[in-house]
């Protein structure tokens, strides 16, 4: 029995030493540092993973924004070309004097022979000279059919811009036409 108690004593001392070393290493500053280092490494991995996902999403959004910018740039280029064409056409139209007639030409038409003074204003009437039954005026007038003389070109430009997907408000702003007139032209073209 003595042997057994000595054996148990050695086992107890061995267990005591083992648990002492185990507790001392588990709660030592080195153990805390090692545990913290492992947690920091794990957090760094998580942050890198989340950052990679965020960068991929950001790159995707940047690509979409670049596509939208290219589309807008293409539409603005087309719009500038159309505005330049419309401005050139308007300038040529005004320079050629098209759309203007003298009162002599208007009064020479059969439908205007009976009432030559209808087109004149009451403020300052030019003096007519008689040539048979046609009164000749030297003042120039512009035919007015409800729309301006340049409206066929402008109408085509408005319709083309609306077919390209531009908003009626934007078209009205850029062409100088009222919004209602632009919307009417767009709706009539459909």
Curated annotation (Swiss-Prot):
CC per GO annotation: membrane
Topological relation to the membrane, as annotated: Single-pass membrane protein
Domain of life of the native organism: Bacteria
Disulfide bonds: none
Bilayer-crossing regions: 1-21
Biased composition (Basic and acidic residues): 103-114
Family: To B.burgdorferi BB0265.
Region called Disordered, residue ranges: 103-130
Compartment(s): Membrane
Protein name: Uncharacterized protein TP_0711
Entry annotated with the keyword Lipid metabolism: no
Keyword annotations from UniProtKB, A to Z: Membrane, Transmembrane, Transmembrane helix
């Amino acid at each position: 029995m003595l042997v057994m108690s000595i054996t148990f004593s050695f086992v107890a001392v061995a267990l005591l030493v083992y648990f002492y070393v185990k507790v001392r290493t588990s709660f030592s500053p080195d153990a805390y540092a090692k545990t913290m280092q492992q947690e920091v490494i794990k957090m760094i991995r998580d942050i890198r993973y989340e950052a990679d996902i965020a960068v991929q999403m950001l790159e995707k959004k940047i690509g979409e924004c670049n596509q939208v910018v290219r589309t807008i740039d293409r539409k603005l280029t087309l719009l500038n070309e159309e505005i330049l064409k419309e401005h050139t056409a308007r300038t040529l139209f005004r320079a050629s004097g098209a759309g203007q007639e003298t009162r002599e030409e208007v009064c020479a038409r059969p439908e205007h022979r009976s009432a030559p003074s209808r087109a004149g204003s009451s403020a300052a009437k030019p003096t007519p000279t008689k040539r048979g039954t046609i009164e000749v005026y030297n003042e120039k007038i512009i035919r007015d059919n409800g729309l301006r003389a340049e409206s066929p070109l402008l109408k085509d430009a408005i319709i083309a811009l609306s077919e390209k997907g531009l908003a009626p408000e934007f078209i009205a702003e850029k062409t100088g036409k009222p919004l209602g007139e632009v919307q009417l032209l767009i709706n009539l073209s459909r």
